[in-house]
C-alpha cells in the first residue's frame, strides 16, 4: 500500500522542468525568461547560449532538462518542441551581515529564484 499516483500537472503533449535555487533576483531572471517565451526549443537554447546575461547559463540548464524530460519520459518529438511557459518566482533569501565602522553591521540579502519551464509539442504546419 502506498500513496495513490498523483495526476500529471501538465498536458500529455507537454513536459516540465523546474530550477528551484537559481542564484540571483527574480527580476533579473525574468529578463532572461522573456527571451525564450514562445520560441522553438532549439532556437531558445541558441539564444541562451549567446546571451551575455549571467543567469542565461542556469536557464539553459533548466531548458535542456525540460527537453530531455520530453524526449525520455514522455516520448515527444524534440524537433517539434516550443517553450510554452517560462515562469519565474522568488525562492529562498540567504541573509548575511557586513561589518561596518564603529562596531555596527548591516544586512546583506542574497536572493534566489525559481524557474519553471514547460515545453509543448506542436504540429508542424
UniProtKB/Swiss-Prot annotation:
It holds the Pfam family Ribosomal_L22. GO terms for biological process: translation. HAMAP family: Ribosomal_uL22_B. Belongs to the universal ribosomal protein uL22 family. Part of the 50S ribosomal subunit. This protein binds specifically to 23S rRNA; its binding is stimulated by other ribosomal proteins, e.g. L4, L17, and L20. It is important during the early stages of 50S assembly. It makes multiple contacts with different domains of the 23S rRNA in the assembled 50S subunit and ribosome. PANTHER family: CHLOROPLAST 50S RIBOSOMAL PROTEIN L22-RELATED (PTHR13501), LARGE RIBOSOMAL SUBUNIT PROTEIN UL22M (PTHR13501:SF8). This is Large ribosomal subunit protein uL22. The lineage of its organism: Bacteria, Pseudomonadati, Pseudomonadota, Alphaproteobacteria, Sphingomonadales.
